[in-house]
């Protein structure tokens, strides 16, 4: 019945010329925000979507998908999403917890017996970036392995003996190593590779047919090419073996697939509501102070209401997604150049849409 009422409302809105004018004005304002950052029509660009109640109300693309071939971006191009991958990793861990195969309170030595101080670091610490372990992306020796094929165990061995930055639970410090560990634990517990687990239990289940574990070798239709900007102009992105970022940043997706992802989270298609909510709450440090990160999402506020946010950055690509639960507003943006960031653009769009729709009420 609720869906029928929404469809009737949308139909009436479509018939009302005043609402069409309202939508056009909103679109013009959104365009202006994006064009202020994405200025080069002949360079790499970005794609953006705004959805309300699960339905797109704005979709537009800017710039080139491939500069050399002069191919324009369209809304259905596939982008590397970088650290937005962490959302999928966190939900996968919660799925395993719901199945009784692990708990977020488990210490990691239960799964990796030789991990230094593994009896003090929990899965919860990894999920919330409070483990204190060394972030491998900050290690100078990363360049030595960046283009090598690494197994999850090899990745863990790469950073596990580094001196820790702080005791588990003492502070929040964004950490990619923690999410690599989560992917490794997922494989040990499930008996599946991370790639296969996400593909089978999430992407296929939700019909996210344009999303996958990233690869530079496979031919992928509608793939956006990544770029970097130097003083001399644009160059192709730095090559990285995706086994290195692994479960911390190796997925590819589209605007429409990410909307399916958000819709599935809203409808609890992957987890029971009480388990899903674990990802979207703030947690406390050892001193009792709350910090603004759940499991795979930053939990912040925008104009006095809660927002769930996460971005991503990997060679040649940037991404950003913002969800406002109280208004069911989802804004997502992708860029195929590290010279154009969708982060502030997406936040500004979300704020504009929130303010506009709130006033319209």
Task: Please name every model-derived segment.
Residues 57, 116-122, 132-138, 195, ...:
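Secretory-pathway/luminal and periplasmic proteins that interact with or process carbohydrate-rich
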Residues 64-176, 192, 228-235, 239:
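Active-site-proximal loop and beta-strand segments within enzyme catalytic domains
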Residues 24-61, 146, 187-190, 196-200, ...:
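Catalytic loop of the DD-peptidase/beta-lactamase superfamily, centered on the K-T-G motif
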Residues 140-220, 243-259:
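Catalytic-site signature segments of enzymes, centered on catalytic residues
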Residues 1-26:
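Bacterial Sec-dependent N-terminal signal peptides
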Residues 48-55, 80-103, 107, 126, ...:
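Alpha-helical scaffold elements that line and support the substrate/ligand-binding pocket
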Residues 218-230:
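Mobile, glycine-enriched helix-loop/loop "lid" segments at the mouths of ligand-binding/catalytic clefts
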Residues 121-122, 159, 174-176, 220-222, ...:
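Short, solvent-exposed loop/turn segments at the edges of secondary structure
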